[in-house]
Amino acid sequence: MTGAVTYKSPLHQMTQTTPTCLWNDSADIDELRYAIENGAVGATCNPVIALGILKKEIGIWKPRIQDLLREQPGATEDQIGWELIGELSVRAAKLLEPAFAEHRGRNGRLSVQTDPRLYRDAGAIVEQAVAFDKLAPNMIVKIPATKAGIAAIEDATHRGISINATVCFTLPQCIAVAEAVERGLRRRESEGKEVRSMGTVCTIMVGRLDDWMKVLLDKRDISVDPGVTEWAGVAVFKKTYGIFRERGYRLRLLSAAFRNHMHWSELIGADAVISPPSVWQKRFNASDIEVRPRIDDPVEAKIVDQLLGHFPDFRRAYSEEGLTIDEFDSFAPTVRTLRQFIAACTDLDGLVRDVMLPDPS
C-alpha cells in the first residue's frame, strides 16, 4: 500500500497535478531558486524588475559597470544599462537550463524585455529581439502588444525567436498576437524550418486591468458590488483561453501582474503559465486555498454584467471587436504601463550615470 503523495507547497502541487506551469516573475537569483524548488520552469523580467535587482545587488554590479565603462569608452549610459540587463538575464537563464532541456524548449526560458521606448518602431524592436535571442539558447523575448509590436511579433516568430507578448490586457490584443504568431509560424513552415521547440506565450497583465477598473471606479463615482473589479482580468483571461483553445492557436497564455489569489487560483488547470512575483508565491504557498482546476468555472454572470454595464473599457477588453489595432497604443492600461516601464529605463540610465559621473558634491 502506497502512502499519500505529498507536495512541497500549493504551487508545487499545481505543477505536478495540472497542465498549468509556474514561472517566476523576476530574474533575481534567490527568488528564482525558491520558485524552482516549488516547481517553476521559467522566469520573466521587465525594466522595473531589472532595475530593482541592480539596486539590490549594487555591490556586485557597480564594479561591473566600472569594467564596462573602461572596456567601452564611447558607450552611453543607456548602452551600458542594456548590457547589464543582458548579463543578469543570462545569469538567471543558466538556472533554467535543466527545465529547458526537459521540456524541449516549451519551458525553461528566461524572458528579457525589449526597450519599451521602441514601442512604435517594429524594425527596432525586431533588431533588439534578434540580439537578445543570441544571449543564450533559452531566451524568450518580450515584445509589447502595440500596433508596431504586433508586426514585430510576426517578424520575430518567422525568424525563429520565441516571444512573450507583453503590455497586453485585452482579448483583441491577444487575438492579434495569436494571429501574428500563426502567420510567423506558417512562414517558417513553408520554408521547411523547425517550429516545435519554440516556446511562445502571450501575457495578460490581469492585475493591471483590475487596477484601471479601480481607477475608473473612483474617478466616475461608480457603485458596484464589493470585489467586482478584482474579477476583470480573470474574466478576460478565461474568455481568451476558451477562444485560444477552440481555435488551436500555438501559443500559451500567461497570467501576470498579481493583485489577488484569483490571478492564480481561478486559472489552475489551464494549459497556460502562471508567473507571480516571489512575494505572491510565498503568500500562495502559505495559504490553505484548495489546488483544483477552476479554469473552466465561469465568472459569475452578475459580476460580468456589472463590469460590462459600468466600465466601457472593460467592454473593450472583453469583446473581440472592442479595440482596433490602431487603438492598442492609446488604451489606458497600455499607456500607464509603458509610462512606468519607460520611467524605469530612465532610472536605469541614472544608476549607470552615478557610476560614470559620481556626484562630486
Which role does the model predict for each range below?
Residues P293-S361:
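C-terminal extensions of enzymes
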Residues M1-D30, Y34:
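N- or domain-start disorder-to-order transition segments that initiate the globular core
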Residues S162-R294:
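Catalytic alpha/beta core domains of metabolic enzymes, predominantly
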Residues E31-I60:
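An N-terminal structural lobe/cap that precedes and organizes the functional/catalytic core
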Residues D28, P47-I49, G86, T114-L118, ...:
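Active-site-proximal loop/turn and secondary-structure-junction residues that shape catalytic pockets
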Residues L32, A129, I150-I153, C174, ...:
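Generic hydrophobic/aromatic pocket-lining and core-packing "Φ" positions
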Residues T20-S26, V41-C45, G108-T114, M139-I143, ...:
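Hydrophobic faces of well-ordered beta-strands that scaffold small-molecule active sites
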Residues I49-L51, K56-A148, A152-I153:
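Active-site beta->alpha loop and helix N-cap motifs at the rims of alpha/beta catalytic domains
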